Design a protein with these regions (language model features):
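Active-site-proximal helices and loops of the catalytic beta/alpha 8
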Residues: 4-99, 104, 125-126, 135-138, ...
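Short, solvent-exposed helix-loop connector elements
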Residues: 117-122
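Conserved interdomain hinge at the start of the Helicase C-terminal
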Residues: 129-131
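FAD cofactor-binding and catalytic pocket of flavoenzymes
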Residues: 133, 145
Length: 167
């Protein structure tokens, strides 16, 4: 995992990714691309048409926009076309912006964000949890489960990073 990938020099990181992958073709570098738009995230993925003629050579980027949509979608109960699971449908129909949607790292939470089960109320909603994990494990991309998510650990980013990383 390459932390804060877009903050580093583009040309250096592109060359670094290419050289590592040339030497170790089965090694995968995941770039933390914490951006709130699929278009912005897709710019950083290897072979992105949005970055042409440049190429980041970064095969796997983190799908932060999907994380946000999942956290909202499984909290909203609506029968209209503006929220709930429609959020996921709408977002996934835009996968054409990615060079390779199957190489996106997908996740419900991580060490920098509030946990999916932010508080005890959300942790007790097992239907919400099961639906979200099922979606995560069956949608396109490479699923990642942050330690503690599987046992419904709680943690709110507003209480500090220590609350997200407790043992």
């Amino acid at each position: 995992r390459q932390d804060t990938h877009p903050y580093a020099d583009y040309d250096f990181m592109s060359r670094w990714c290419k050289e590592v992958n040339d030497e170790y073709p089965y090694f995968n570098i995941v770039g933390e691309t914490w951006l709130n738009s699929n278009v912005l995230v897709s710019f950083w993925q290897k072979d992105s048409k949005l970055a042409a003629p440049r190429n980041s050579n970064l095969k796997t980027v983190m799908d932060f926009p999907l994380m946000e949509h999942m956290n909202k979608a499984f909290d909203e109960e609506t029968s209209d076309w503006s929220g709930g699971l429609y959020r996921l449908y709408d977002y996934l129909t835009q996968d054409l912006v990615y060079a390779d949607p199957m190489n996106l790292l997908t996740f419900l939470d991580n060490h920098d964000t509030s946990r999916f089960t932010t508080n005890d109320e959300k942790a007790q909603n097992l239907t919400r949890f099961k639906q979200a994990v099922t979606f995560l494990l069956t949608t396109r991309g490479i699923p990642q489960i942050y330690y503690g998510t599987e046992i419904l650990m709680t943690g709110d980013k507003s209480e500090g990073d220590g609350m997200l990383r407790k043992d």
